[in-house]
A protein has these predicted regions:
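Flexible, glycine-rich terminal cap/loop adjacent to redox cofactors
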Residues: 1-116
């Protein structure tokens, strides 16, 4: 079973607050590293404020989620934006790319998945 880790608000909490927001989701199925590990279940999700891009929440369901969430905890602690995560170099192919890709997807700029 995949691990689950999160920090910050859920999408439901942000929606209930009335604050405009955007989300980016990256499925681990699109991660070469996750597929090689036979751990392609789950996703990484970034929730950011629409107006100033501040990260409001990050949710990871997938391989090593408990390890991967540390970057998101730091991002929230320092009021980072999804663009801050987008500009951070993530090695390829790694599981940590999932957070990078989810941040890119929030602005419809994902590299390894479909932009919706």
């Amino acid at each position: 079973a995949p691990e689950i880790a999160w920090v910050g608000q859920t999408e439901e909490q942000v929606k209930a607050s009335g604050r405009p927001y955007k989300t980016g989701v990256f499925p681990f199925l699109a991660s070469g590293r996750a597929r090689a590990m036979e751990g392609a279940q789950g996703f990484a999700k970034v929730i950011a404020a629409q107006n100033d891009d501040e990260i409001l929440g990050v949710h990871i369901i997938g391989p090593l989620a408990g390890e991967l969430i540390a970057e998101a905890v730091l991002a929230l602690e320092y009021s980072a934006s999804s663009e801050d995560l987008q500009r951070t170099i993530h090695a390829h192919p790694t599981l940590s790319e999932a957070l990078h890709e989810a941040a890119l997807a929030a602005d419809k700029r994902a590299i390894d998945s479909i932009n919706r």
